[in-house]
């Protein structure tokens, strides 16, 4: 009898150990870190500069709508199993989201300059990336507020000879860290461009472009609902998405609206002036290319402090 009890106790311990190990493994498998990059031009209802910056008469309201769309993505990601969420405020001055309306367990990256730009904070610990409020690239004739990085200064950005949008550029940075883009929101033109570049990701169409400054848009409530639905769908099949990879080293071509930036940058040996308004540079990978583009966009001799 005593021997039987010893055997039974041993079996029980073994079962407990196996069960604990399985529980630990399952817990590790359930970890899901999500990065959400939030721009504003692709937010439902946005059509002109009046919604996009502090001087616009509708900016205050549209900060709320932008935050609502980000929150819809966050809540849906949590419902789909996300255990860690990092949000990058990636429009204008990088200080648009009403962060007091976001959950306490979310981290938020704000303002500039910052490494990796619109996808700052992404690394190889992230499992999936989401783009909210994205817009079409500067060479697109139909997208609402279409531009690439700077509507005031740039007319073209190309990566390995192919014109890029902010979406495809940021997808390539994420791909450098083996992070797939699983979902995006924006107008129909923006979605079509990104899908053409990186594949058939989940997408929430917040509006249909009628021109640079006009759109047939969903309401803020409907946009948020559609974003939530598509985020849940994307994370429900997250293993099906693959990182967007570009060949390294990378070659980047940048064309400016004015000739002086190209002339002055060409003084630096890393830049080659390819025509009156354009420069070219090469980088070992997308992380380095991102840093150089950040320098091009952010450096001013009168920067303070």
For each predicted feature, which ranges?
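Mature N-terminal segment immediately following signal peptide/propeptide cleavage
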Residues: 28-49
């Amino acid at each position: 009898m005593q021997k039987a009890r010893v055997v039974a106790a041993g079996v029980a311990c073994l079962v407990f150990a196996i069960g604990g190990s399985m529980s630990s493994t399952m817990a590790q498998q359930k970890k899901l870190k999500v990065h959400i990059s939030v721009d504003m031009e692709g937010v439902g209802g946005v059509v002109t500069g009046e919604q996009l910056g502090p001087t616009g008469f509708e900016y205050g309201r549209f900060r709320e709508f932008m935050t609502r769309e980000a929150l819809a993505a966050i809540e849906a990601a949590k419902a789909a199993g996300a255990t860690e969420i990092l949000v990058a405020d990636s429009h204008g001055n990088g200080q648009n989201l009403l962060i007091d309306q976001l959950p306490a367990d979310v981290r938020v990256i704000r303002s500039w300059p910052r490494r990796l730009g619109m996808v700052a904070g992404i690394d190889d610990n992230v499992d999936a990336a989401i783009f909210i409020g994205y817009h079409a690239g500067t060479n697109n004739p139909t997208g609402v507020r279409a531009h690439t990085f700077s509507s005031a200064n740039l007319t073209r950005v190309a990566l390995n000879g192919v014109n890029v949008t902010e979406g495809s550029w940021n997808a390539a940075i994420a791909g450098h860290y083996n992070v797939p883009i699983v979902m995006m929101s924006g107008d129909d033109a923006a979605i079509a461009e990104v899908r053409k570049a990186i594949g058939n990701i989940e997408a929430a169409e917040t509006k249909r472009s009628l021109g640079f400054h006009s759109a047939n848009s969903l309401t803020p409530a409907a946009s948020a609902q559609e974003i939530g639905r598509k985020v849940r769908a994307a994370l429900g099949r997250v293993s099906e998405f693959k990182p967007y990879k570009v060949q390294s080293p990378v070659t980047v071509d940048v064309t400016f609206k004015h000739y002086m930036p190209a002339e002055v940058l060409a003084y630096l040996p890393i830049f080659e002036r390819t025509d009156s308004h354009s420069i070219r540079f090469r980088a070992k990978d997308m992380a380095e290319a991102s840093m150089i583009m950040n320098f091009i966009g952010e450096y001013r001799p009168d920067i303070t402090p």
